[in-house]
Amino acid sequence: MKMKVLEVVGLAISIWLMLTPPASSNIVFDVENATPETYSNFLTSLREAVKDKKLTCHGMIMATTLTEQPKYVLVDLKFGSGTFTLAIRRGNLYLEGYSDIYNGKCRYRIFKDSESDAQETVCPGDKSKPGTQNNIPYEKSYKGMESKGGARTKLGLGKITLKSRMGKIYGKDATDQKQYQKNEAEFLLIAVQMVTEASRFKYIENKVKAKFDDANGYQPDPKAISLEKNWDSVSKVIAKVGTSGDSTVTLPGDLKDENNKPWTTATMNDLKNDIMALLTHVTCKVKSSMFPEIMSYYYRTSISNLGEFE
């Protein structure tokens, strides 16, 4: 009897996994016609797509768990008649791969350490063995990307710089590996910071917006770089604060300010309003949840639907 129950449960889980789409609906960012305002709206939509629907910490939203389905959110970066589709893990905001159109067909590009399902996530139904046109020859870390694209501190973040790098690789032959890999790595370094890092950090979002239309964009300063390295640790420090309201928080030891000086403390209000936009998934010492927001939503929905049965 016990075995039959386990078999039924296993079958139910298998059916659920088959019915659950691997990725949520695409979020579109029109780079060609972007403004600082549409960029900010895009980041808000991305945060909504990856956040835990029930939990917050000190009023801040957090990413969902790594086991929550769907696994990915797809982001379409549009420019002219072309579109790059990025596959981003909802649980940690890692970029696992992307696709463009090459020779009239969807072409996937995946890192050496990409998730095994990234290929079919960006190019549904493509089970082909990865070749020169598909393999990104390094891991998805900054170290990997910088090995081909150079230091990210020298690459500006903004509309013009992003569009420029998109145009250099979209639909281009990847067999000219030296030049293609340099252009691709620069695109990835810019896209990752403008999409995933800016989703995590209001500080980076606001810096990019301030230089959004500048030819050279915003060159990441030491504060931004140190935040990029410490998303987990800053989130955990916030989670350990046991009192609600404003307070002074001791920050992780290797954070830097804009002038590359040690940045040791911040107020909770500063972290909430100016630095963080999305925490990693944490266990918060102060109990909080999305319950009031959820109940408010259902109340408004039920009230608005009362007239439908008249």
From Swiss-Prot:
Gene3D superfamilies: Ricin (A subunit), domain 1, Ricin (A Subunit), domain 2. InterPro entries: Ribosome-inact_prot_sf, Ribosome_inactivat_1/2, Ribosome_inactivat_prot, Ribosome_inactivat_prot_CS, Ribosome_inactivat_prot_sub1, Ribosome_inactivat_prot_sub2. It comes from the Eukaryota. The active site is at Y94, Y142, E197, R200. It is an enzyme of class 3 (hydrolase). Keywords: Antiviral defense, Disulfide bond, Hydrolase, Plant defense, Protein synthesis inhibitor, Signal, Toxin. One of its GO terms (biological process) is negative regulation of translation. Its EC number is 3.2.2.22. The keyword Methyltransferase does not apply. Residues 1-25 form the signal peptide. Disulfide bonds join C57-C284, C106-C123. PAP-II is expressed in early summer leaves (at protein level). PAP-III is expressed in late summer leaves (at protein level). Pfam families: RIP (PF00161). It catalyses: Endohydrolysis of the N-glycosidic bond at one specific adenosine on the 28S rRNA. SUPFAM superfamilies: Ribosome inactivating proteins (RIP). GO terms for molecular function: rRNA N-glycosylase activity; toxin activity. Possesses antiviral potency. Inhibits viral infection of plants (tobacco mosaic virus). Inhibits protein synthesis in both prokaryotes and eukaryotes. Belongs to the ribosome-inactivating protein family. Type 1 RIP subfamily. 2 forms exist, PAP-II and PAP-III, that differ in their seasonal expression and chromatographic profiles. Both depurinate genomic RNA of immunodeficiency virus type-I (HIV-I) and bacteriophage (MS 2) RNA. PAP-II and PAP-III inhibit the replication of HIV-1 in human peripheral blood mononuclear cells with IC(50) values of 26 nM and 17 nM, respectively. This is Antiviral protein II/III. It comes from Phytolacca americana. The lineage of its organism: Eukaryota, Viridiplantae, Streptophyta, Embryophyta, Tracheophyta.
